[in-house]
């Protein structure tokens, strides 16, 4: 692996083109990735930390960027859910390789209200509703048991909507720091950090690559 290298050829990131609001800048980058039909343009690598300080990470899908923060949905009883309950400080990274772009978000995760979770769950495909309802996420389970539970719930609810399980819902990550990275030749990458100030405004600065 030591000989695997990627040279970047993009023009980089011009500070004057950055929005003063990093959440709006994040929307721009995600929208551009979606419009370019990149694979999984809304995928984030979410890092959480357990009560004893052990970090873990996994890929989840971002489902919204609002004025307050970034929203995703999951099982509250999963490992990430339990770790967020113990320590709501989280971080995630988004990487769009064809664009030589990376975004890092640091903040705290808060549960969204039940109405928002209900609304999104109802919008999911029927099969996704069923699998979410039966899955004891992050717990040991055999394939046979999972398939039997799917069959049982499909008989109980042969069509959508399936009731949203209480242990499934959304989180909104309220950011305190957002970084935007853009690859450039010779590893002289562009990197800008926004830090939220006490008055709610954002301060932007360039970081060395």
Curated annotation (Swiss-Prot):
It comes from the Bacteria. It catalyses: pyridoxamine 5'-phosphate + O2 + H2O = pyridoxal 5'-phosphate + H2O2 + NH4(+); pyridoxine 5'-phosphate + O2 = pyridoxal 5'-phosphate + H2O2. Transmembrane segments: none annotated. Its cofactor is FMN. Its EC number is 1.4.3.5. Keywords: Flavoprotein, FMN, Oxidoreductase, Pyridoxine biosynthesis. One of its GO terms (biological process) is pyridoxine biosynthetic process. Pfam families: PNP_phzG_C (PF10590), PNPOx_N (PF01243). FMN binds at residues 58-63, 73-74, 79-80, 102, 137-138, 181, 191. The keyword Flavoprotein applies. InterPro entries: Pyridox_Oxase, Pyridox_Oxase_N, Pyridoxamine_oxidase_dimer_C, Split_barrel_FMN-bd. Belongs to the pyridoxamine 5'-phosphate oxidase family. HAMAP family: PdxH. Catalyzes the oxidation of either pyridoxine 5'-phosphate (PNP) or pyridoxamine 5'-phosphate (PMP) into pyridoxal 5'-phosphate (PLP). This is Pyridoxine/pyridoxamine 5'-phosphate oxidase. The gene is pdxH.
């Amino acid at each position: 692996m030591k000989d695997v290298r990627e040279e970047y050829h993009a023009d980089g990131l011009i500070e004057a083109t950055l929005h003063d609001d990093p959440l709006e800048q994040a929307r721009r980058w995600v929208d551009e990735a979606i419009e370019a039909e990149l694979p999984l343009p809304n995928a984030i690598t979410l890092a959480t930390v357990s009560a004893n300080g052990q970090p873990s990470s996994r890929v989840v899908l971002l489902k919204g960027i609002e004025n307050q923060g970034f929203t995703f949905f999951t099982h509250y009883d999963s490992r990430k859910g339990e770790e967020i309950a113990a320590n709501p400080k989280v971080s995630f990274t988004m990487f769009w390789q064809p664009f030589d772009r990376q975004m890092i978000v640091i903040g705290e995760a808060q549960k969204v209200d039940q109405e928002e979770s209900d609304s999104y769950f109802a919008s999911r495909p029927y099969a996704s509703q069923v699998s979410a309802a039966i899955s004891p996420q992050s717990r040991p389970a055999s394939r046979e048991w999972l398939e039997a539970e799917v069959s049982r719930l499909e008989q109980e609810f042969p069509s959508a909507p399936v009731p949203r399980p209480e242990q499934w819902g959304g989180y909104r990550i309220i950011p305190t720091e957002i970084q935007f990275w853009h690859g450039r030749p010779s590893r002289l990458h562009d990197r800008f950090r926004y830090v939220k100030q006490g008055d709610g405004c954002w301060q932007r600065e360039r970081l060395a690559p």
